[in-house]
Amino acid sequence: MKRRALFATLTLGALSLFATLAPTAFAQTPIKFALDWRFEGPAAPYFVALDKGYYKAEGLDVTIDTGNGSTEAINRAASGAYQFVFGDINTLVRFRDKPESKKLKVVAMIYDAPPFAIVSLKKAGISKPKDLEGKTLGAPAADGAYAQWPAFVKKNGIDASKVKIENVGFPVREPMLVEGKVDAITGFSFSSYMNLRGRGIAQDDIHVMLMRNLGLELYGNGIIVDSEYAAKNPKIVQGFVRATLKGWQDAIADPKGAIASLMKRNSILNDGQEFVRFKMAIDQNVLTPEVRANGIGGVDMKRLARSIEQIGEGFKFSNKPKAEDIFDASYLPAKPERTITQ
């Protein structure tokens, strides 16, 4: 009886101690993460990381919100409202040019090749960059692809004076192309392509020119964080990056499963269309030869430096950042953990 009483006392004591320590020892740090766009195919990997408990395993209680472009995402990080955002590194380069700007950095590159593209219908007869001369190009002023237009023009020998630029809104960009009000548009390749397919345009009638394949060495979207926050919270940043890259690795291995995670958050989507959109992002923007060789998440700092020079062809720097001002690899997992085997 004494043994039983002693065991009961010890058990109750242990449970009491566990109850006292649990909130501290197992507390999850709240994290807000903003995307650059809606919950569509390319957002699926983050929900994979969420559903598989990768963020939770790092002690992070992550909330994922939609966005409205990289400029908004970067401003959200700069304001401190979000600890992490997914945004375009080229937009960040321009943002960092301001001396008073928050010292935001990319800590994991996701789109090794940016989705910036010139999209047209085949009836317009635009098969190469020079064919844009004499045409009307529909481009939203805030579009990330349009921001690269000066460098694209220079690299491809286009006479910009012969191209009429029509400032169009994001919602009417593809409709105006379908209606023939513009001859071509700037945009993200997978978004514009899927929007046109959704409007009944046949696959063979859509022509996409990826700027990455036509002379631009730019990178695309990555995970952005305030460097001051990162310095104060290195384990949080390391954990978030590690969990996010695991989500991407799993999503690449099982894209249909990834889309199933996405559909839980946006059930009005067409899962077949989002699968195609996601596969386009994987094949065109994520799984480049560089990523297959070196793993996901990193960058070539020399290429990044060259990309900053290319941005300068259409943007007048007053305080041009260096590559090391823009990307910090110190929070990445070791290369074997970032390898893509597909």
Regions found by a protein language model. Name each.
Residues 1-13:
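Bacterial N-terminal signal peptides that target proteins for export
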Residues 21-27:
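Sec/Tat signal peptide C-region and signal peptidase I cleavage site
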Residues 27-179, 183-190, 209-211, 216-217:
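Short, glycine-/small- and polar/acidic-enriched structural segments
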Residues 63, 71, 167, 209-211, ...:
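Short linear loop/turn motifs
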Residues 89-90, 99, 171-176, 181-271:
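Pocket-lining segment of extracytoplasmic ligand-binding domains
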Residues 160-164, 203-207, 268-280, 317-325:
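Short, surface-exposed acidic
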Residues 232-316:
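Secondary-structure end/capping motifs
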Residues 302-342:
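Conserved C-terminal helix/tail region of periplasmic/extracytoplasmic solute-binding proteins
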